[in-house]
Amino acid sequence: MIKKATLLTAFSVTAFSAWAQDTSPDTLVVTANRFQQPRSAVLAPVTIVTRQDIERWQSTSVNDVLRRLPGVDIAQSGGAGQNSSIFIRGTNSSHVLVLIDGVRLNLAGVSGSADLSQFPVSLVQRIEYIRGPRSAIYGSDAIGGVVNIITTRDNPGTELTAGWGSNSYQNYDISTQQQLGENTRATLIGDYEYTKGFDVVAKGGTGMQAQPDRDGFLSKTLYGALEHTFSDRWSGFVRGYGYDNRTDYDAYYSPGSPLIDTRKLYSQSWDAGLRFNGERIQSQLVSSYSHSKDYNYDPHYGRYDTSATLDEMKQYNVQWTNSVVVGHGNVGAGVDWQKQTTTPGTGYVPEGYDQRNTGVYLTGLQQLGDFTLEAAARSDDNSQFGRHGTWQTSAGWEFIEGYRFIASYGTSYKAPNLGQLYGYYGNPNLNPEKSKQWEGAFEGLTAGVSWRISGYRNDINDMIDYDDHLQKYYNEGKARIKGIEATANFDTGPLTHTVSYDYVDARNAITDTPLPRRSKQMAKYQLDWDVYDFDWGVTYQYLGSRYDSDYSAYPYRTVKMGGVSLWDLTVAYPVTSHLTVRGKIANLFDKDYETVYGYQTAGREYTLSGSYTF
């Protein structure tokens, strides 16, 4: 970790009087520019979620955490473990870069988009969420934003947790962190989660085979980490985790053919790193390996039957990141190397393929009086489509003490996935999707209210669409996204309020029709308070209407799904200094709604849990 005093000196954050009041570790951000900096110095909109937030919200999935955040819209085909799409500021789910401890999520390489319905929430210790373009820093996918899930734990001791709930939900978790001598720390986490689920396919003509069954989810997770401090300036770590998930779902059925309605996912990841932390220079070298095997099969025949499908991918990464204090700011530079290897049949690609990418980036941030300037540039050399460059720049002006205006522009891109390149309908001549984004924002601190209002536009060209007539993928799509985002947080006595509002006009720029499964308006509100040691929380979420396709009709038709207001209620009580009991009612008023046409949501659900620390 970079020493806090060094950071404060480097950025002279005392100039930002409205935003520099809190200097706790939770206000330091690494994801925005790939070097640690106070959140007040980040010009892009950023949200930080801590483990304490997740426990207070009593979230049982990563999707439940993310749906509370500004700009995030999630469409899911049912309940726990079912396929989901994350839309940030109206962009495609493939335009969201998901990192695990700064490393690209392995499963995104197969489909081209990250589905976090399978990732265990028990591993999440912190989330850094950046909105807007970040390809100039991270490369492909970072068009709508970046979600960095951090698993590093900083909570010595042992915690046992057990929970039960609706639909036969069960969760058992043990985590421990212990010192092994003066300079070594070990962490171990084990987690088991199970739910019988519910029948995810909605009743009525949806084009699906009627399967009146429960679609359950089972997940087993193991995590281990070892950290060692060699000296005041040198430290290192090694960690690994794996999870074994089984998901039941409803699928299309053809008479005389096996019914493929079960998913089995094995995933493991390992990484090791070495850090140097000088007074003015910081450097980190990280090497990682991940391997996933994703089966879809008929349980009557098993996952090794010829009717089953297997998506198998190995991913190798090496990252070298550096930053140096220059003037009143930092300059960062680094190299990313990645290799993805697939087996034959993965993503319906007949042959196995290797894809390599080497990226070189440069970032800089300077504070000049009342102005903060930020810029980044990156060049990627890909074994498939060659070299591609991106850049971005931002400027912030504190025109009155406590009030700042921010303007930014950035380019970003999305590389074609393996299925689009080499699948049965693939096109090896595809080019990356390209984006240009503009944003203007005001932020300030007024009468104890910390607020930000942003307006943005995103033009995406060369989008990869499937051509029904030519039966191939081509770069023929365009999207135009305009939006307004407003956020605020404040306290009134014992009450803590967090509010956000999003207006997103995401359209196909060729046909001028709305992009599917996105709400045009979203409003979110979180209220927390303590009364006589009871920690209460109320969550409100309004999701506006959205459009989707009805495939039960031929040709398929576009349907409009209405908006919905959802309420959650949580409470926690510390029975002793070691034992805490928690309860939650999700979807308090049992609203019936869909985010994917034809797929039901859970309705009202109850959970009760307890945790014991020692």
Swiss-Prot record:
The keyword Electron transport does not apply. CDD domains: ligand_gated_channel. GO terms for molecular function: ABC-type vitamin B12 transporter activity; metal ion binding; porin activity. It comes from the Bacteria. Its main location: membrane. Ca(2+) 1 binds at residues 199, 211, 213, 215, 250. Involved in the active translocation of vitamin B12 (cyanocobalamin) across the outer membrane to the periplasmic space. It derives its energy for transport by interacting with the trans-periplasmic membrane protein TonB. This is Vitamin B12 transporter BtuB. It comes from Salmonella choleraesuis (strain SC-B67).
